[in-house]
Amino acid sequence: MASFTATAAVSGRWLGGNHTQPPLSSSQSSDLSYCSSLPMASRVTRKLNVSSALHTPPALHFPKQSSNSPAIVVKPKAKESNTKQMNLFQRAAAAALDAAEGFLVSHEKLHPLPKTADPSVQIAGNFAPVNEQPVRRNLPVVGKLPDSIKGVYVRNGANPLHEPVTGHHFFDGDGMVHAVKFEHGSASYACRFTQTNRFVQERQLGRPVFPKAIGELHGHTGIARLMLFYARAAAGIVDPAHGTGVANAGLVYFNGRLLAMSEDDLPYQVQITPNGDLKTVGRFDFDGQLESTMIAHPKVDPESGELFALSYDVVSKPYLKYFRFSPDGTKSPDVEIQLDQPTMMHDFAITENFVVVPDQQVVFKLPEMIRGGSPVVYDKNKVARFGILDKYAEDSSNIKWIDAPDCFCFHLWNAWEEPETDEVVVIGSCMTPPDSIFNESDENLKSVLSEIRLNLKTGESTRRPIISNEDQQVNLEAGMVNRNMLGRKTKFAYLALAEPWPKVSGFAKVDLTTGEVKKHLYGDNRYGGEPLFLPGEGGEEDEGYILCFVHDEKTWKSELQIVNAVSLEVEATVKLPSRVPYGFHGTFIGADDLAKQVV
């Protein structure tokens, strides 16, 4: 997430929680630190329970741990030499602005942070960041790696480079990609920061200076932080012209490129090196064709090979644009979709002939900051609706809007057409309260897997929970269907069991017709994230494997599980050399596609 000064958005991710950890040796603990120790300008900092290897003393204390959980001691790292060079004017301006920020921080210290912006909650336990990990090969495997799995599994996540100065939401962290490569019957692992423009500048400055969209931009102090950022930009201390995003949410492999994405910027191309390492190529604008941001969940049509995407703006009209790319990367003209107000549109869906655009009740109202509130607002007076637009429309004049009251789906898992009833069927997880991820709420979060039917003839909609038995309802968030059938009718969805929220205790294989649920649980004190379904070579929809990172909070070890998607039995477990924090979305790049990678 980046500042709301340009297009900003948020990704479907869960919040931090409190965890405990066992004593660790110094060698085991090294992967629990932040990134390398870096020079830092003198400043007043808010005293937090989260400390970092970036600062002295070199210890990382996880907040709100049990009394028998000691501090984790890490070795200080050598300081980087590539610090930002400033002229006399810039040094003077930086000192003055740092002093102003110190005053602002001292003011913020007088007010308690909500849980949704409290670093001691948001990046506690296995939500905390890790160091980069160079490639480690020939990892231990329990069981046998399936012969058909050849390629690399990559997963994105938020991993803040620096200790938060004030408020921090889990979504605010810098992007880090974790990669497990399968080759010659063995597995390797690496993780690297995506070196965004924001990341590179903050690394040079040795401190966080870009505004955090959720953790910091609230009320008058949020406005003050924006003004500080503008002033630093005017003085040449920071340069937002080449992007302010974190690239921490989605991943897509398209036209020979792996793209890391967040809604607040252009995508970043990340290269998978021949030995399984990760290297940031740079900000990718599709050869000069993409001039706006792009949401983190573009869709690749499995039949045509085209990429479909949206871009939304929270400041100026048009608030929403739709576009597509041909398989060779040629972009279509933008289709401007008229909205009355800027709206959070984290995800959307495609069918064979249409794009399905959710216009829901979580909106951006920047004037709320003037009144002391959050700019991310649940608008109870707005009626949620879905727009159905022809995939190849040249404008939005024929978009058909269908109301779907009180429906907020952070993610849409699939959609398809049923011509016999003139309906478009949408599968999504309906979340209540809609803004609970961003704003504190007394109501427990619920995420109900739902079937939404949009009748193109009558303009009416219906919605039903797919799991009809109320006693069997569980929070289902983060997952997918068979990607080879995206936009076509699917029988199964594979979704994270987001319980106890915000942790993920396993995943569910759900029959979308009958509501039957089969669960794979990770076990006591073991949690994971989004399950990735990797289709097999056979003809059955559910033939294949499910890949998921799992972390044991008792042993403080992480692994990659490979689960048979039919039987839900674990076929192999790859033991990882360092901790993998809970994260967001991933994808799999087969060996054949990897061989065609653009470098």
UniProtKB/Swiss-Prot annotation:
E.C. no: 1.13.11.51
Keywords: Abscisic acid biosynthesis, Chloroplast, Dioxygenase, Iron, Metal-binding, Oxidoreductase, Plastid, Stress response, Transit peptide
Keyword Chloroplast: yes
Cross-referenced Pfam families: RPE65
Reported tissue expression: Localized in roots, leaves, stems, empty silique envelopes and seeds. Expressed at the point of organ attachment and the abscission zones in the plant.
A cellular component annotation (GO) from this entry: chloroplast stroma
Cofactors demanded by this protein: Fe(2+)
Location of the protein in the cell: Plastid, Chloroplast stroma
Binding site for Fe cation: H297, H346, H411, H585
InterPro entries on file: Carotenoid_Oase
UniProt entry tagged with the keyword Magnesium: no
GO biological process, any: abscisic acid biosynthetic process
Protein name: 9-cis-epoxycarotenoid dioxygenase NCED3, chloroplastic
Species the sequence originates in: Arabidopsis thaliana (Mouse-ear cress)
